[in-house]
């Protein structure tokens, strides 16, 4: 209990000051908020003021006061009723218990509900004990599922029963904060050793931060499947919305959000320094420097800082390759520079800013090869559960999984049924509206929101074909914004004269928006979108939010509109074609690409194109474009571009190549893509894999250390009668003579003897000879081995090649053409 203590005594004056500053920016909105604060207790009002003082403008525009009231009331309740919470340093309580936002998720009131669900399970526990217990509760309510980029609210993850790692961690952080455990989400923004990223959770107890995998409970802290992976990261970061930073190395700001470097808790690190010179060779003060890793065949930022008065900037990072780009506006133009360095052997580098272009400074139309080396596996967190803890954890996780599977068995969104079943005579269009939404949208959409969009779109149904009307007029979704009502609000903002004028000249919608809606990037988080109705409510919105408002206004007026899927430029339909709102985004040039036949080209897997804009390269979104007969023609805006190609090797390293070019208005540039092949020795790893046991046919067990003790072996965990497994078995049978020589070194692992009766596996065993057959239930081992070898354990077959006892040199999972040839090369 917090008897005798004054709530937020140390920060009260600061909160009041920051709240008043926020008020001054949006006085018309805060007048209503102040009325509602007057109805709250002093403690709850102060908690609300803290939330409003440090939330992005988008939150103020998107959500009602009552949403934040839940977070404030629960925070005050915990402070009053939980002595551990009351004793927390105020900056820890404010940022990591009270605050409503975790990252870029939708916000929905959830804290009081979660506390009532979890409270009895954690009563009387320390923060450490409560964190472990809450994670078991999270596992029983949600699990991993690959979804689109829109981040669900914590409550939606709970109701849906699954989410991607960023959503699982948002859910887990909210659950932990709901019972007073200080918690935050941390991110490896991009891995260096594979094309992906990952988010997990840190909790604060005993004066330090500890980590856990969201919805992936363990019996101890500082353990997760990503322990080894995080030791190969070049960056792990957290974020804080407050302007008073509790601790840590600042690695950049995203509007009002400060990014903090947490890598030292996970990996071996060192400090590197970059010196930036201007075009005259003098120190470039205030230059923006982006530290990047090559991931999904594009340079992805992991930290963004500005140089000091000496033109220098420093960063603590991992031991591997990092790409550095810098930009600065000077003498009426943007200057740019790039370089790469291997931090394992280099401590510093120097780059010189120059204009970009054929007639200016930086320019070269030739392929340049670059090797990007991933940090080696060197985990700094080595705690392991005891055998007893491991057994208890397995049992509890099985119970959580069983509970969740029962919960989601017949799960559906009642709001969808409510919308579909309303008897109004437009049932076919109701169905089409739901169909145009994403699968994720259908799990958390609200009937009233859909009703509003249907009502105001239907008058335009007969004026165009359904394949235009449904996706580009009726469709309530534009990008990754929160789905809300906005059509009535938009129409109320416009006079009849304005409606008629904008329908005749849709491009003027953007002028209307520019006149009415301002951008305040220092008060926003770039990835948190202000909804169309939120923009109108506050009169503010980021550039992307305003683009979404353009599409929303056009659709409300019956004009088919979209954001171009390649570059998010605004477009509306005229004479059956989408045309750009801005002449600057007109596709007035093109590129003709020729690809080699021996490489399967896939965008964001082994190639990408980026356009230079304001001194910074932005990657085009071309996932839907494919080569035909090894050729592709793409419309482009005139300007400077960079093509990247990459060959990700099994050991995590990348053989990359860059090609810079400029294309003029009306020009078609011809480029032949270059792909770098690797030698066998470049592809191999030396990874120690943990001991495990497999079953023989008679029920006895054999240790993996014994199986792999003598020379090279192939361990293949097979999923019989599934195409990826069938494919590798067929490849092996096509070269049966070669594989038969190594039959005694090949180990097939299946779930049961019944698998041996399936046609393809049975035929393969007959052709290949004395292949060893062992058994496992696939419940744990494949997950551990897949993660350890840095391949996807959810994709079978899982194939590992060892060269000595418990030492993996190569692994692959899922469907991969040519695996048979690779295995023979390795043997």
Question: In which residue ranges do the predicted regions lie?
Answer:
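Secondary-structure boundary elements
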Residues: 3-160, 388-538, 548
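Short, internal strand/loop/helix patches
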Residues: 762-796
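Hydrophobic/aromatic-rich core segments of domains that either
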Residues: 2, 116-136, 145-155, 160-253, ...
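Short active-site neighborhood of thiol/selenol oxidoreductases, capturing the structured segment around
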Residues: 704-729, 745-749
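A short, amphipathic beta-strand motif
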Residues: 270-281, 589-599
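Short, acidic Ser/Thr/Gly-rich low-complexity loop/linker segments typical of extracellular
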Residues: 295-317, 335, 614-631
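Structured interaction patches on ligand/partner-binding surfaces of diverse proteins
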Residues: 331-356, 649-676
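Short Pro-Gly-centered beta-turn/loop motif in secreted/extracellular proteins
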Residues: 309-325, 329-332, 340-341, 625-651, ...
